[in-house]
């Protein structure tokens, strides 16, 4: 746990299918009621933070790909939310899952059912982005949610891993991506400029990214924070809490690690930079 910066919410990533049926599991492996996971969630809540259950991610099978009906899918999502004691649900949809129109539609139907039963449920979508904005598949997902009367509180864009041709400043890319996505959200949801900013969140991959030549620095984090405050966005976040520390050998790295940033820093420095 990283208490630096006093985060208001932790995204718990990820709940996915166990691979073949409609059973939600942490990382596709651990039962949603796993005692060790429950203990960690309790510790996060005791710090004063809320928790948001994030479904999907880059690996494994998202539940909409393995559940046979909207009602069963809604039940699976609800079970995971109940296990975590959460009223915040995020759907991190990327890769092949984003292009699967059948699962996109089923997910929208299930979320709508879930919101009918849970009036306090706040829903966000986490989607990949480029400096030019959201791609056609992401727009189609948001339109599906709209068509099924899903109340979308926030669209969280992943300002990271743009590709080998993007070798410029990562802070600048984050801002450019946000500006483009803002205009798209205003169009899809019929929002005012202010409303579109309030419905947008930014998540950056701190330190060394998965793509060569992409490194998000502490200065970039401060730049994103300042921009977010100016525009009034919903939140800024990072991938991930476990990475917000210097690697053991203290040196910079050319490869992204799961447990450290790959840049020189003090523990929790990125959280503090985002918090201001």
Q: Predicted regions: what is each one?
A:
Residues 1-191, 195-201, 205-221, 247-273:
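Chitinase-like catalytic core of GlcNAc-active glycosidases
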Residues 201-204, 235-240:
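Conserved active-site loop/cleft motifs that coordinate metal ions or position small ligands
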């Amino acid at each position: 746990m990283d208490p630096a910066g006093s985060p208001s919410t932790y995204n718990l990533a990820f709940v996915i299918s166990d691979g073949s049926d409609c059973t939600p599991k942490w990382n596709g492996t651990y039962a949603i009621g796993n005692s060790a996971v429950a203990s960690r969630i309790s510790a996060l809540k005791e710090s004063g933070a809320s928790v948001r259950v994030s479904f999907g991610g880059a690996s494994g099978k998202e539940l909409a790909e393995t559940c046979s009906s909207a009602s069963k899918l809604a039940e699976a999502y609800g079970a995971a939310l109940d296990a975590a004691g959460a009223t915040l649900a995020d759907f991190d949809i990327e890769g092949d899952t984003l292009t699967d129109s059948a699962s996109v539609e089923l997910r929208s139907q299930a979320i709508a059912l879930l919101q009918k039963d849970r009036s306090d449920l706040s829903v966000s979508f986490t989607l990949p982005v480029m400096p030019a904005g959201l791609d056609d598949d992401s727009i189609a997902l948001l339109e599906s949610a709209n068509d099924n009367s899903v109340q979308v509180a926030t669209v969280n864009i992943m300002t990271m891993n743009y590709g080998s041709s993007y070798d410029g400043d990562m802070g600048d890319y984050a801002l450019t991506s946000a500006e483009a996505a803002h205009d798209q959200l205003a169009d899809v949801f019929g929002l005012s400029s202010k409303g579109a900013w309030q419905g947008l969140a930014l998540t950056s991959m701190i330190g060394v990214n998965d793509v060569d030549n992409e490194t998000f620095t502490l200065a970039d984090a401060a730049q994103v924070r300042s921009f977010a405050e100016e525009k009034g966005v919903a939140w800024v976040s990072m991938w991930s809490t476990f990475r917000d520390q210097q690697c053991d050998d203290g040196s910079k790295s050319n490869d992204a690690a799961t447990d450290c940033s790959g840049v020189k820093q003090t523990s929790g420095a990125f959280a503090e930079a985002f918090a201001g």
